[in-house]
């Protein structure tokens, strides 16, 4: 949008740069949907699409006829597998409306159903519970993050974990809070805050909040 409309700062990469990574994630997670060839909605690595119900099919047909095929009503694309993934011990969607409660069949993609089991299967996963990360440790000499400081919520003791790579995956607000709480004399506004934007213009996805 930035390049086409000539506004703001353009991205340094394009969709084609990200496409292989999108494909990798889509195949791993399992995305059902239909390939429509729409420029505004790029196709993905889809599993067979869920079917529209009778009413939806009727509405879709009328929309297509009314707009001479220029507008489409399609099934929503979602991370519900419609074909079993035995390598992940996941079975296809059972249409039980239990997605939001943590699908017991593993059909709806989640950390519990897919990524944690895959990580555990490598033999390189150590899962720590009751640990609250309070700070990312920044090594001034190496000029990189080298670990995290955590508080054990049960013992009320502080521990330090080191790693070659640190991933910050605590959602919008907690990730921002953690980076700000990791401020140093090099990064007084928070770790990585070179633009002054950290802590500002934060966006999050709220679900059913009045």
Per-region residue spans from a language model:
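Conserved redox-cofactor binding core of oxidoreductases
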Residues: 2-133
């Amino acid at each position: 949008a930035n390049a086409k409309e000539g506004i703001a700062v353009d991205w340094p990469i394009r969709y084609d740069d990200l496409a292989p990574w999108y494909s990798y994630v889509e195949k791993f997670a399992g995305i059902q949907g239909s390939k429509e060839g729409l420029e505004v909605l790029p196709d993905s690595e889809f599993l067979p699409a869920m079917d529209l119900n009778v009413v939806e099919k009727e509405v879709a047909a009328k929309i297509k006829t009314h707009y001479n095929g220029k507008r489409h009503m399609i099934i929503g694309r979602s991370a519900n597998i419609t074909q079993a993934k035995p390598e992940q011990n996941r079975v296809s969607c059972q249409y039980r409306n239990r997605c939001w409660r943590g699908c017991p069949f593993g059909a709806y993609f989640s950390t519990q159903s897919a990524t944690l089991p895959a990580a555990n299967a490598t033999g390189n996963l150590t899962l720590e519970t009751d640990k609250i990360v309070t700070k990312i440790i920044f090594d001034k000499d190496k000029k990189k993050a080298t670990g995290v400081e955590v508080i054990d919520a049960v013992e009320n003791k502080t521990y330090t974990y080191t790693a070659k790579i640190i991933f910050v995956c605590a959602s919008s607000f907690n990730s921002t809070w953690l980076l700000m709480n990791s401020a140093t004399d090099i990064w007084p506004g928070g770790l990585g805050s070179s633009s002054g934007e950290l802590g500002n213009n934060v966006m999050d996805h709220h679900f059913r909040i009045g």
